[in-house]
From Swiss-Prot:
Residues 1-138 are annotated as: Disordered. This is Dehydrin Rab16D. Keywords: Stress response. Induction: By abscisic acid (ABA) and water stress. One of its GO terms (cellular component) is cytosol. The gene is RAB16D. The keyword Glycoprotein does not apply. Residues 39-51 have a biased composition (Basic and acidic residues). InterPro entries: Dehydrin, Dehydrin_CS. GO terms for biological process: cold acclimation; response to abscisic acid; response to water deprivation. Belongs to the plant dehydrin family. It comes from the Eukaryota. Residues 90-105, 117-132 have a biased composition (Low complexity).
Length: 151
């Protein structure tokens, strides 16, 4: 039984201009036509197995001085710290920020709602402040909390 595209010929094996096998069937012409799209000839540049770099050199912020005259690649943590405000501080400086609320006494006494809650087993305390605005934390604030030395 013959299928579509087969017209009683026998299969022959040929190679194209790049040495790849090209199988044709029957006596159909193998040029343009018959649904075949010819690719434009491309010139392959041979480098004899040697990788060559371009003469262009550009400065990149993905590496920094390692202190010994060489360069080293920055980690993802260092790149994130660079983008955050205050992230360009030296690694030796550990600044801790304290969030305090000062209340001033009015005619009826202090108006702030600062409370300290004992955590029990660990003996520490956790400060909670009830803000009138109830402002939610943004993504950047959440990331800042997770970075060491930012509290």
């Amino acid at each position: 039984m013959e299928y579509q595209g087969q017209h009683g010929g026998h299969a022959s094996s040929r190679a194209d201009e790049h040495g790849n096998p090209a199988v044709t069937t029957g006596n159909a012409p193998t040029g343009m036509g018959a649904g075949h799209i010819q690719e434009p000839a491309r010139e392959d540049k041979k480098t004899d197995g040697v990788l060559r770099r371009s003469g262009s050199s550009s400065s990149s912020s993905s590496s920094e001085d390692d202190g010994m005259g060489g360069r080293r690649k920055k980690g993802i943590k260092e790149k994130i710290k660079e983008k955050l405000p205050g992230g360009n501080k030296g690694n030796n400086q550990q600044q801790q920020q304290e969030h305090t609320t000062t209340t001033t006494g009015g005619a009826y006494g202090p108006q702030g709602h600062d409370t300290k809650i004992a955590t029990g087993a660990h003996g520490g305390t956790a400060a909670t402040t009830a803000d009138a605005g109830g402002e939610k934390k943004g993504i950047v604030d959440k990331i800042k909390e997770k970075l060491p030395g930012q509290h």
